[in-house]
């Protein structure tokens, strides 16, 4: 099945945002996509962050969906040094993936004062082509061989 064409999105002052969904696991994702269940999922706005090697979502989403946590924390090198943060498993759905979901490990962060719910890092971008047109005030994110 071919992925849908990648739409062009307008840039906003804080960067490229992309809408998606966070699902708890593969079975709930498939049940929702096959219209066999009303399992909980979270619609999200995610900032494309090419400088991050791992994606992250807000603590409130992790809590609301009761995402499974790994026993060992992730070590993230960011502003202020290296931090130890919770690492969780989820399924990320972006429209550019067609009907597929991406099993993903994410870190939980504090995005409550941001206009987005988390970030898309290079762990997701490795499956995508990201085109950033600053002068045109546009960006395109498309799935490649997904």
Where are the language model's segments positioned?
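Pepsin/retropepsin-fold aspartyl endopeptidases
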Residues: 1-146
């Amino acid at each position: 099945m071919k992925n849908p064409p990648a739409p062009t999105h307008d840039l906003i002052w804080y960067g490229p945002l992309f809408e998606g969904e966070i699902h708890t696991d593969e079975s709930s994702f498939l049940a929702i996509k096959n219209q066999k269940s009303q399992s909980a999922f979270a619609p999200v706005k995610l900032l494309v962050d090419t400088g991050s090697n791992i994606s992250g979502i807000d603590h409130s989403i992790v809590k609301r969906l009761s995402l499974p946590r790994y026993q060992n924390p992730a070590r993230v090198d960011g502003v202020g040094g290296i931090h130890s943060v919770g690492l969780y498993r989820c399924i990320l759905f972006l429209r550019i993936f067609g009907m597929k979901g991406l099993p993903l490990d994410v870190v939980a962060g504090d995005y409550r004062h941001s206009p987005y719910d988390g970030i898309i890092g290079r762990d997701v971008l490795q499956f995508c082509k990201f085109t950033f047109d600053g002068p045109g005030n546009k960006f395109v994110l498309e799935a490649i061989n997904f």
